[in-house]
């Protein structure tokens, strides 16, 4: 049976299909295996992908980019605030939710971020259907390890709205390991794997323990100040300085000219991963003046040396955080398009001279391929009633419940620390005054620092219409079960009356 894996990144999206025992990436209608995660709006239509990217220079205020950065977030979220401040497309808050205010020239449209993501997922579904047919809609969708529950939910709902049957959300580093069959080739062995993902806007690092075919995240770290776009911007700034040197005009304050240079720099960056030099030509960059500049790989590496240093220092910091040395790492998996850069690969190899550097699968395809393999496993399980051949067993963040201490201050209790092997079950007794007729159990997630400022509420269970007691306390027993597939089931029971309520929250495994 056929199945689909989709990776929606900040700057691009990619779809792979699992069929006849193997997973392969599918090229879109433009012949490209990776599609820009960009949506352009006009009065009559929405355009997704390369065409939207090409038209952005002319229609920047009606073209949405990097929607993943704002998906499922509120205006109070620092990352959303940063996105809003940098977005060329106006973002407003309406009825407590963020919306794009898009001026098409003929009318103004309010668009939900989830609708933008839905259009990108629809493009991925259309691409997959070109080889599988329209009956194949079972999908596994990848999510970053540091995504909160609201972001995961928004991503899954957008995929569902596009017509996909979402089998599971899977963390990106887990998908990368699946793509290489790590843990399946020697299912009884134990190893530590570094997953290095340099995406369009961030660097994500994870140390994974592989033991008896099962994965566990030991530590993870994401840096938003290093990404493929930062390498592109560095090269574009150099091109702008060269134009100023040659033509005595600084275009760095001209948004349209800089967007042209960014596009040219991006093409050159890709070329320099395989060639010793690249030509950057921009037609009519400023006041009709064409610009032609040749950039060598050596020049590019010199310009980007501060970014390379940030990447290697991030690896060293993650090792310190884990309590590891380089000798404790057995394999390194490269993900994300910018991890193709030869200089970066050499620097990583220098850090781990005795370690296999896995890059035989194109780095921008490895995550969707792993997702497609997981989808194939799940579809096969449904058809054969067999067990999963791969278990992804790890909670991503601390899961906490909120209570109140004797002084009335909020108190958070960690029930599932990040990295908890799954499945897992916990019990928690919540005490409330007997005189109240309703009790609310609030669930939070955090990065593990156990600070109230770090925690984000993602679900709650409310017991209502309880019989009041004249005095004393009421005991509410909460039973939380996190399954192997990542879903969290919560049941709250009033110990006096037996009245109970239950919810299920989907969590990426």
From Swiss-Prot:
Keywords: ATP-binding, Chaperone, Cytoplasm, Nucleotide-binding. GO terms for molecular function: ATP binding; ATP-dependent protein folding chaperone. The keyword Ribonucleoprotein does not apply. The keyword Cytoplasm applies. InterPro entries: ATPase_NBD, Heat_shock_70_CS, HSP70_peptide-bd_sf, Hsp_70_fam, HSPA14_NBD. It comes from the Eukaryota. Pfam families: HSP70. GO terms for cellular component: cytosol; ribosome. CDD domains: ASKHA_NBD_HSP70_HSPA14 (cd10238). It is found in: Cytoplasm, Cytosol. Component of ribosome-associated complex (RAC), a heterodimer composed of Hsp70/DnaK-type chaperone HSPA14 and Hsp40/DnaJ-type chaperone DNAJC2. Belongs to the heat shock protein 70 family. Component of the ribosome-associated complex (RAC), a complex involved in folding or maintaining nascent polypeptides in a folding-competent state. In the RAC complex, binds to the nascent polypeptide chain, while DNAJC2 stimulates its ATPase activity. This is Heat shock 70 kDa protein 14. It comes from Mus musculus (Mouse). The gene is Hspa14.
């Amino acid at each position: 049976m056929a199945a689909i894996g989709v990776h929606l990144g900040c700057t691009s999206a990619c779809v792979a299909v699992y069929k006849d025992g193997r997973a392969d990436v599918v090229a879109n209608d433009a012949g490209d295996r990776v599609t820009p995660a960009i949506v352009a709006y006009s009065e009559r239509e929405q355009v997704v992908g390369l065409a939207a990217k090409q038209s952005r220079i002319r229609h920047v205020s009606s073209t949405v980019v990097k929607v993943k950065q704002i998906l499922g977030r509120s205006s109070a979220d620092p990352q959303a605030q940063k996105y809003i401040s940098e977005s060329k497309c106006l973002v407003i808050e309406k009825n407590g939710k963020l919306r794009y205010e898009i001026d098409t020239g003929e009318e103004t449209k309010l668009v939900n971020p989830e609708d933008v993501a839905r259009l990108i997922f629809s493009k991925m579904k259309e691409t997959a259907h070109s080889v599988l047919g329209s009956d194949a809609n079972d999908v596994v969708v990848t999510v970053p390890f540091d995504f909160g529950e609201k972001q995961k939910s928004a991503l899954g709902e957008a995929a569902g709205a596009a017509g996909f049957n979402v089998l599971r959300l899977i963390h990106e580093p887990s998908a990368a390991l699946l793509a290489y069959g790590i843990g399946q080739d020697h299912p009884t062995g134990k190893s530590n794997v570094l997953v290095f993902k340099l995406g369009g806007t961030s660097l994500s690092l994870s140390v994974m323990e592989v033991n008896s075919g099962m994965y566990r995240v030991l530590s993870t770290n994401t840096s938003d100040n290093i990404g493929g776009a930062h390498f592109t911007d560095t090269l574009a700034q150099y091109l702008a300085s060269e134009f100023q040197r040659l033509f005595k005009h600084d275009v760095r304050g001209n948004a349209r000219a800089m967007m042209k240079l960014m596009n040219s720099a991006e093409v050159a960056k890709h070329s320099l991963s395989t060639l010793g030099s690249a030509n950057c030509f921009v037609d009519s960059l400023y006041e009709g003046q064409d610009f032609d500049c040749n950039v060598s790989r050596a020049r590019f590496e010199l310009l980007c040396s501060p970014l390379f240093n940030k990447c290697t220092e991030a690896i060293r910091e993650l090792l310190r955080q884990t309590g590891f040395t380089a000798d404790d790492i057995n394999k390194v998996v490269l993900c994300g398009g910018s991890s193709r850069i030869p200089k970066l690969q050499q620097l990583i190899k220098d850090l781990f001279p005795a370690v296999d550097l896995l890059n035989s699968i194109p780095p921008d395809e490895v995550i969707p391929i792993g997702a497609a393999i997981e989808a194939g496993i799940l579809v096969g399980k449904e058809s054969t009633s067999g067990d999963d051949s791969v278990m992804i067993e790890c909670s991503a963040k601390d899961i906490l419940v909120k209570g109140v201490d004797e002084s009335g201050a909020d108190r958070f209790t960690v029930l599932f620390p990040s990295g908890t092997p799954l499945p897992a079950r916990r019990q928690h007794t919540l005490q409330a005054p007997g005189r109240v007729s309703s009790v609310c159990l609030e669930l939070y997630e955090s990065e593990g620092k156990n600070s109230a400022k770090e925690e984000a509420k993602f679900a709650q269970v409310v017991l209502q219409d309880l019989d009041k007691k004249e005095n004393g306390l009421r005991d509410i027993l909460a039973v939380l079960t996190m399954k192997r597939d990542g879903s969290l089931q919560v049941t709250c029971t009033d110990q006096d009356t037996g009245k109970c309520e239950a919810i299920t929250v989907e969590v990426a495994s």
